[in-house]
Every structure is written in structure tokens, then in C-alpha cells.
Amino acid sequence: MDLSLHVALCLGMLALCLAMPPKEKQVRWCAKSKSEFSKCRDLVNTCKNKEITLSCVEKSSTDECLTAIQNDRADAICVDGGDVYKGSLQPYNLKPIMAENYGSHTEPDTCYYAVAVVKKSSTFTFDELRDKRSCHTGIGKTAGWNVIIGLLLEKQLLKWEGPDTESLEKAVSKFFKASCVPGAKEPKLCQQCAGKKEHKCARSNNEPYYNYAGAFKCLQDDKGDVAFVKHSTVPEELHKDYELLCPDNTRKPISDYKNCNLAKVPAHSVLARARDDKSKDIIAFLQEAQKTKECKLFSSQHGKDLLFKDTAVSLVPLPPTIDGFLFLGAVYYQEIHALKEGVKEDDLAAPSKVRWCTQSKAEKTKCDDWTTISGGSIECTEAATAEDCILQILKGDADAVTLDGGYMYTAGQCGLVPVMGEYYDLDDLTPCQRRSSQAKGVYYAVAIAKKGTKVSWKNLRGVKTCHTAVGRTAGWNIPVGLITNETNNCDFASYVGESCAPGSDVKSNLCKLCIGDPAKPLDSAKKCSPSASEAYHGYSGAFRCLVEKGDVCFAKHTTVFENTDGKNPAAWAKDLKSDDYELLCPDGSRAPINDFKRCNLAEVPAHSVVTLPGKRKPVVEILVNQQSLYGRKGFQKDIFQMFQSKDGKDLLFKDSTQCLLEISEKTTMQEFLGDKYYTAVTSLNKCSNTKSGLLSSCTFHSC
């Protein structure tokens, strides 16, 4: 082909490509009934978006919609907590991306109350529900099934030995006289439903008694004696005719739902595929739709609670890291699981082992050694970071881990409790000799600099800083919190120069000094990781960063002593002298490194072992036993030592730990951390750019 013709053809094709409009973005909403599909078609016409088009996919049930989204034949649906649980599991693998807000635009409320509504003319109490006629929103739904059935089991009013004996539906059908539970397979649970032919007992609006309004209509029509719905279901003009049935066997007015409810539960949420980025388009479309006056997301001429609940005032985007488990919360998630799988005898028995979460290969190696000599009392799990360990414990995949105060704050916000604290004071070992002691381990957060440099606490602007990790106490929360308060500036990265703060955005200024794994320089995934795979992570890592690159290092008061004067044989540390380093004091002066009690940034709580509240007792008992064997004064300390690290520093526990002290069961995380430190971390986390993804997920709502 002639060269000029070839060039002309290429240029023509290029021009054609450039002239073609970009591919149109589309959000396909799944409607699970004809009335929902009609509302969806209305929204197509009224919720116009210049960049994103809405289309509607009609299915006959929530399950069909979940399958359609999984198979990329639809993109989104708004469901209740029970379906969030189902959608988050295999094979669907969906995640919540937005939540309905029932509060106001300025004070969002993404929770609601599950209640039991009865007619005022009736007289029975909660404990007298047996043999009553019941109206439910739908099988597997939060207010209409999961909460009430879970509560009946908990109060032992309903007997169920588990799915191996009989189905839960069968057990419930024996408890109530007759019911309407849309979606149920047990005939007696569909007896009171009003749908015609194939629509009778359908888990969609094709069944008149489906959902909140439907369950209440079932009660109104005298097809039931009680309806399990949400706190806002009963119209205000009908409050005079109905009451709430309280679990304490009293009754209260409909308006007193905060003092008479079955549970406070997470809002309905929008589900989307977890594996792709379609979530961005869905969120963008819905945010724009809420600004359009003609776009009526939360009402419809075609019926009640179609696509979204009518009581919602807006849709709130969820933190990107949130999944079904974190959205629902550990307690509710496990309750739903128990309703699906039953409670096994093994779940009720006291654990005979502690599954310890490790955060690096070196920790796993030490833990494996511990497992071998523990007689089965210790097992090990693997995680990449402290936050991954917190998540493992929440999900029941691990039992315990030792955390720094910063991560303890996050753990507490996620529902874990402190059970044993590290104790460091070599000068007073009396507390280690008692089973219970009021003593509490503390250490000091300090700023370390090389002797002879001009840097001080008062002139940190533009200096190179080294941190243990984002979210940790001495290396981040204390220094960054103090600097943020003093400068009234949340943008710490712009205040200092280059930094290594493992856990930061790898492209940011806060990761510039990080080096990853020196043994694998081409593995960019290791750089700035909040784990041992980043050489500058942790106390020793932050100090190494100071030695090799930085101007100031934020660590604990023993860090210099543990890495100088021959204490650390690593190549980078073996020739270092402690006299070559000084402490930076908050008043702008400097002090010798042994003057930490006077010259420090804060006295902070010791690292602590955390676990779930229900596992506190076995974790403490096993650790007390293991400490008596392998602690500093252990009978078998020659075989293994819990508080020493052969192949690294501070593995599983800090090497300076003298013993573990039991923390009183009544001690809250806030009390253990101390009000001053707790308040400092809370203030620091108001800076959105410093708040971790897990913390954002755990604190998104309080239900």
C-alpha cells in the first residue's frame, strides 16, 4: 500500500475515533414487582442526568434481583439488612454502597427500630405470643423476621434445636397459630397472606401483605394479632388504635418506640457488585437525582415503599471500605448467621485454645514455635496489618492480638475489648506477682533527633519525619494530634517535608521516605505498607528511617536504647551509639534520651490484648496459664519466651514487656486508654484525611 494512502487511512480512522461520543454510562435498577417497575419507569423520565442514564430491569423477587446483579444483568437494588447479609455471601458477592437516611440532611440517621405492633383492644403480652396470628414483612427480613425470631429464641419462648432437626420455618409455624410471612415455604406461614394464585405469599409487592405497609395491613384486616414492622410504619392518625408490644411484657404508645422496641437495626442500603467500579456511577446518579426536584425517589403514586422506603429523606454514601459485615455490625451479622445455621454445641462450649493473629512472617514464625510447645492452647492466623487482625477477630476467624493504643481505639470503636495489658516497669515488678492488680503499664511517646542538628519541636515545618505507622500512638496519634492542634491545620502532609508514615497513600508526601523491603526493591506493593514488609515500619523501623533519611523520629522512650550500643545486631544498627541522639521537648528545648519522664510528648497507655467481649474469659485464662510457663519468670522459659523476639523486634508482644496484667472486665476501652488520650485521638480523627477505612466503617452508624 502507498505510504501516503496508509497514513491517510490511519489519520481518518483516528479522526473517526475522536469524533465518536464517549460510551454512555448506564445504571440498571432492579425492580422486584410490577409496581416497583412502574415507579422505576417514572424515575427514568424525571431523574434526568447528562452523563448517566437510568434503565429498569423487572424481576419477581429480591433473590432474582441479586442473581441479576451478580450476573451483570442489573446493577443495583435497595434492600433491608437481612438481604444485605444474603447478598454479601457467595455466590452474589455484593456490597452496600449507600444507606437510606431517616434523620435529616444535617443530622443523618441510618438506623431504625424494629417493633411489634398490636391493637389496643387486645390484652396479651410479649411472653404470650405463642398461638397468636402473626404478620411479617417477609422471610429473612430484618424487622419482620430476623429480629423477632432471634428474640423469641433468645428468651427461649421459641424452641429450635437447629436445621439438622427441623427447619426454622417449621419451628416457627408450630409457635404461631397462623401467619403471613411472604417468601416462606412452610404452608402454615403463608396461611394468612392475601395474594392471588401464584402471587400468594410472594416476597414482593405482588403479595398485598408484603413489606412494612403490607404487614400492618394484615393486622388492620384482622388477619393477624401482631405485626412485626418498623417504628414509623403506623400512620400518625392511627396511633390511637394501636400499641407497641414490649419485650418486658408491658405495652407503650406507638410514639414511644425508643423505649419499647425489639432492636435498633441498620437502614436499608443500596447493593452493587463488589468486583467492579459501577458503584461510582450508581452513587453519582443517586446523588444528582436527590438534587432534582422532579425526581421523587422516596414516594410514588404506585404504592408504598417502592424501590426505597418512603420514610427515607436521602441516601448517604458509605465508606468505600465497608462491606456487608461491617455495615450490619458483628452482633447482628452473627445473629442472622445463627438463624440460618443454628447454634452448634461447639459454639456454646468454652474455647480451649486462642487463635492468635500475626502480622508478619517473623510473627508467624514465633507464633508457630509457641503453638508447638503450648499443647494446643495457641493457634496462629495470618494477616497483613493490625486492622486486618481486628477484622479477623470481629468475623470470628481469630481470637486475640496485641495492639498499640491507636489501633486499640479503632478496635474499641469496632466492638472489641481490652483484656490484658503489657507492663514494662523494671523498677517495680510487684504487680507481676499478683493475679489481679490495679497497676497499669504505660510508656512515653517521644520525638527523637540526631545530636548536633538544629531541628526542634518549634520548627518542624518542612522537616523530614519518620513514623511507626498511621494510627499508632507514639508514632502518629500523639505527634500529629499535637501538631494539628497547635497549627489548626488538618493537612499534616503539607506542614512537614517528606515523610515515611506507613499506611498513608503511597503516592503522597507521607510515603516519600519509605523504602519497602530492601531485599525486594522491585516489589512496590511493600512500600509504605503498615506492616513489617516496610523496613521503616514500627518503632525500630521509624528509628532506622531517622538514621538513614530523616530529621526526626516519633517513637517510644525505649526505642533508642533497644537499637543502639550493640542491642540490635542488624547491619544498619550494630555500630550506632545512644549518645548520638537526643529528645525534642514540647517547649522547644532538647534533652538526653534518658530524660524521657520530663521531656516527652505524652504518657500513653500500654499495648493491650484485645478480643470480643464473649471470648474475654477463655482468652485471659489461657494467657495467664501461658505466661506462668513462658513469661519472664515462667517455669519453662528456657523452652520458649513470650516476651523475646529472636528474628526481629517486638514480635507478638513488645520486647520490653515484663508481664501481662489482667484488665478488669468493667473497664471500657475509653477508661483503659484514658480520657486525655481518647479525646486526642477522637479529635485527630475529625480530620477526614487521617481517619482509617476500618474506623470509618465501624463508626458509620451506631446500630
Curated annotation (Swiss-Prot):
Disulfide bonds join C30-C65, C40-C56, C135-C218, C180-C193, C246-C260, C357-C389, C367-C380, C414-C698, C432-C659, C466-C545, C490-C687, C500-C514, C511-C528, C585-C599. Fe(3+) 1 binds at D80, Y112, Y212, H268. GO terms for cellular component: extracellular space. Residues 27-341, 354-686 form the Transferrin-like domain. InterPro entries: Transferrin, Transferrin-like_dom, Transferrin_Fe_BS. Pfam families: Transferrin. Monomer. Transferrins are iron binding transport proteins which can bind two Fe(3+) ions in association with the binding of an anion, usually bicarbonate. It is responsible for the transport of iron from sites of absorption and heme degradation to those of storage and utilization. Serum transferrin may also have a further role in stimulating cell proliferation. This is Serotransferrin. It comes from Xenopus tropicalis.
